Swiss-Prot record:
GO terms for biological process: L-histidine biosynthetic process. The keyword Lyase applies. Keywords: Amino-acid biosynthesis, Cytoplasm, Histidine biosynthesis, Lyase. This is Imidazoleglycerol-phosphate dehydratase. Pathway: Amino-acid biosynthesis; L-histidine biosynthesis; L-histidine from 5-phospho-alpha-D-ribose 1-diphosphate: step 6/9. Its EC number is 4.2.1.19. It comes from Clostridium botulinum (strain Okra / Type B1). It catalyses: D-erythro-1-(imidazol-4-yl)glycerol 3-phosphate = 3-(imidazol-4-yl)-2-oxopropyl phosphate + H2O.
Amino acid sequence: MKESIAKVYRKTGETEIKSEINLYGEGKYDIKTGIGFFDHMLNLMARHGLIDVKLEAKGDLQVDSHHTVEDVGIVLGESFKKALGDKKGIKRYGTSFVPMDEALASLSIDISGRPYIVCDFNFTVDKLGEMDTELVEEFLRALAFNAGITIHARVLYGKNNHHMIEAVFKALGRALREAVDRDERINGVMSTKGTL
């Protein structure tokens, strides 16, 4: 499988982020956001998606983790969009159900060029480490809107919030891997319109 590499750099008054991804990698990762729990989740996404991710973020963590998490979603979304290029030959859709002990999450992706997000999470704690659990949805929204993809994510059940969020990020990686997979039978893009 050929490489599909993208580099993105973004600097604002709140964050400075640089990333490099290879959509058809081996799941290697070197991720430093300053938010330990978030790094752990992004590592899982990369590993289970077989996406190589190098990412370094410096943010205003003295305020809280919101800007950093959201802006990482923006940068990764831009990276995915750039790495996908013309989208010719990709399967377009990906769905994954991932169990993590007592928790089960599902996540579906459509690389449609039409950003949309639906999340159904019922986390029972406000924070895990230094990350607010509500930022899981903020990250996914930023990713979807900047990559131009639709994401439907749901935690079907679970008791341990770490397990629930871990299942979501593993499912994200696996769904991305399925959606960007290329099929030589697909002539052009997977759409009757001829464009995504």
